[in-house]
Amino acid sequence: DSFYAVMKFFTILYELSRCEGARSLSSSPFARVETHSDSRRIQMIQQYINQNYKQDIRLGVVSQMAGMSPVAFSRFFKTRTGKSLSEYIIDVRLGYAANLLIDTNNTVADICYDCGFNNLSNFNRIFKKKKNCSPKEFRENFRRKKKII
């Protein structure tokens, strides 16, 4: 009986993976998967960003933490992560924002500012560009899918 339940579960997961309109609801930085980088500098900076994403994070401060010039650090970070520092920070903030949109009833504006963005229209524009929908649509889509399941 439990074997068939597990098989049914895997069948459902398989069908969902093949769904044409499937979209990811969470970005990889939010998943907080341990970094594959062997660099202590990168790990230290990623930890700093995850702990301080609500604050203004400056390249000069972060590069100083890593003991590098801003130009050298930018090159080093992009080589190791595949993203610029600002892209990485935005992805982390969007991950937290997506989580808050799903788990809370906070307004989009509150979530925007709680996640370190300082401009609501900029937040909406970036969110739509990265997630292919507005924050409001993201929340509505998730809640609609949650009711179906």
Predicted regions and their residues:
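Residue at a beta-strand N-cap/secondary-structure junction
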Residues: 56, 105-106
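Pre-recognition alpha-helix immediately N-terminal to the DNA-recognition helix
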Residues: 41-48, 95-99
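Intrinsically disordered, low-complexity basic tails/linkers immediately adjacent to helix-turn-helix/homeobox/MYB/SANT
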Residues: 145-149
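Two-component histidine phosphotransfer core
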Residues: 3, 7-10, 54, 76, ...
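Basic/polar phosphate-binding segments, predominantly the helix-turn-helix DNA-binding elements
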Residues: 28-36, 48-94, 112-141
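Short, structured helix-loop boundary elements
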Residues: 6, 39-42, 59
